[in-house]
Amino acid sequence: MAKSKDVRVTIILECTSCVRNGVNKESTGISRYITQKNRHNTPSRLELKKFCPYCYKHTIHGEIKK
Protein backbone atom coordinates (compact mmCIF):
# COMPACT_ATOMS: atom_id res chain seq x y z
CA MET A 1 0.00 0.00 0.00
CA ALA A 2 1.15 3.51 -0.77
CA LYS A 3 1.71 6.12 1.90
CA SER A 4 -1.22 8.47 2.37
CA LYS A 5 -0.67 12.14 1.64
CA ASP A 6 -2.74 13.44 4.54
CA VAL A 7 -2.82 17.15 5.15
CA ARG A 8 -2.49 16.72 8.92
CA VAL A 9 0.57 14.84 10.11
CA THR A 10 1.63 13.73 13.58
CA ILE A 11 4.89 15.27 14.76
CA ILE A 12 7.13 15.02 17.83
CA LEU A 13 8.38 18.14 19.61
CA GLU A 14 11.59 17.78 21.62
CA CYS A 15 13.13 20.19 24.13
CA THR A 16 16.04 21.99 22.48
CA SER A 17 17.78 23.03 25.70
CA CYS A 18 17.85 19.46 27.09
CA VAL A 19 19.36 18.17 23.85
CA ARG A 20 21.88 21.00 23.64
CA ASN A 21 22.99 20.78 27.27
CA GLY A 22 23.13 16.99 27.33
CA VAL A 23 20.45 16.81 30.04
CA ASN A 24 21.11 17.69 33.68
CA LYS A 25 22.87 15.16 35.89
CA GLU A 26 19.83 14.57 38.11
CA SER A 27 17.25 14.39 35.30
CA THR A 28 16.39 11.12 33.61
CA GLY A 29 15.35 12.09 30.09
CA ILE A 30 14.37 14.58 27.42
CA SER A 31 10.99 16.28 27.28
CA ARG A 32 8.90 15.30 24.25
CA TYR A 33 5.39 16.25 23.15
CA ILE A 34 3.28 14.68 20.39
CA THR A 35 1.01 16.94 18.35
CA GLN A 36 -0.32 17.46 14.85
CA LYS A 37 0.32 20.11 12.23
CA ASN A 38 -1.20 21.04 8.91
CA ARG A 39 1.35 20.35 6.19
CA HIS A 40 -0.07 22.99 3.82
CA ASN A 41 -0.18 25.84 6.36
CA THR A 42 3.13 25.02 8.07
CA PRO A 43 5.59 23.48 5.60
CA SER A 44 8.65 24.38 7.71
CA ARG A 45 9.65 22.82 11.02
CA LEU A 46 7.42 23.76 13.94
CA GLU A 47 8.79 25.30 17.15
CA LEU A 48 6.59 25.92 20.19
CA LYS A 49 7.32 27.14 23.69
CA LYS A 50 6.29 24.35 26.08
CA PHE A 51 7.05 23.40 29.68
CA CYS A 52 9.97 21.02 30.16
CA PRO A 53 9.70 19.01 33.39
CA TYR A 54 13.43 18.20 33.26
CA CYS A 55 14.58 21.84 32.95
CA TYR A 56 11.77 23.05 35.26
CA LYS A 57 10.94 25.97 32.94
CA HIS A 58 9.31 26.89 29.63
CA THR A 59 11.67 26.22 26.73
CA ILE A 60 11.48 25.99 22.95
CA HIS A 61 10.49 22.56 21.70
CA GLY A 62 11.38 21.88 18.07
CA GLU A 63 10.07 19.34 15.61
CA ILE A 64 12.23 16.23 15.14
CA LYS A 65 12.28 13.44 12.58
CA LYS A 66 10.44 10.23 13.30
From Swiss-Prot:
Domain of life (superkingdom): Eukaryota
Q: Which UniProt keywords apply?
A: Chloroplast, Plastid, Ribonucleoprotein, Ribosomal protein
Q: Which PROSITE patterns match?
A: RIBOSOMAL_L33 (PS00582)
Could you name the Gene Ontology cellular component terms for this entry?
Answer: chloroplast; ribonucleoprotein complex; ribosome
Q: Report if keyword Ubl conjugation is assigned.
A: no
What main location does UniProt list? plastid
Q: Does the keyword rRNA processing apply?
A: no
Gene Ontology biological process terms from the UniProt entry: translation
Q: Where in the cell is it found?
A: Plastid, Chloroplast
Q: Which NCBIfam families match?
A: PRK00504.1, PRK00595.1, rpmG_bact
Family, per the entry? Belongs to the bacterial ribosomal protein bL33 family.
Would you tell me the protein name for this molecule?
Answer: Large ribosomal subunit protein bL33c
